[in-house]
């Protein structure tokens, strides 16, 4: 093996198999490009992005880890969103959640 070399299984690798996703229309109403990373809580993105934030709550872009989607000024496009998995607790971003995404989480913190 060469340092940094990847040795992948033969065939296609499917991401997020069995996870429910949905498509949502997003418009950049601002005058500057906006880039959103793969694991950013989509409901907390830049306020110049216009979309149903309530529907996007607890979701992230359905794109490979480490990548991003760019929204140019005036651009309208559809994106796929996936629900966060695991403990469903998020911290940071714009500070709108800072804990459990769901009221029934055992974390002791709710939105």
Swiss-Prot record:
Catalytic activities:
urea + 2 H2O + H(+) = hydrogencarbonate + 2 NH4(+)
Q: What class of enzyme is it?
A: hydrolase
Q: Which cysteines are joined by disulfide bonds?
A: none
Q: Name one GO cellular component term.
A: urease complex
Q: Which InterPro entries match?
A: Urease_beta-like (IPR002019), Urease_betasu_sf (IPR036461), Urease_subunit (IPR050069)
> Biological process (GO) annotations?
urea catabolic process
Instruction: Give the main localization category.
Output: cytoplasm
- Which keywords, in A-to-Z order, does the entry hold? Cytoplasm, Hydrolase
Q: From the Swiss-Prot or TrEMBL record, what is one GO molecular function term?
A: urease activity
Compartments where found: Cytoplasm
Listed CDD domains: Urease_beta
* Similarity comment: Belongs to the urease beta subunit family.
How does it associate, per the subunit comment? Heterotrimer of UreA (gamma), UreB (beta) and UreC (alpha) subunits. Three heterotrimers associate to form the active enzyme.
Q: What is this protein called?
A: Urease subunit beta
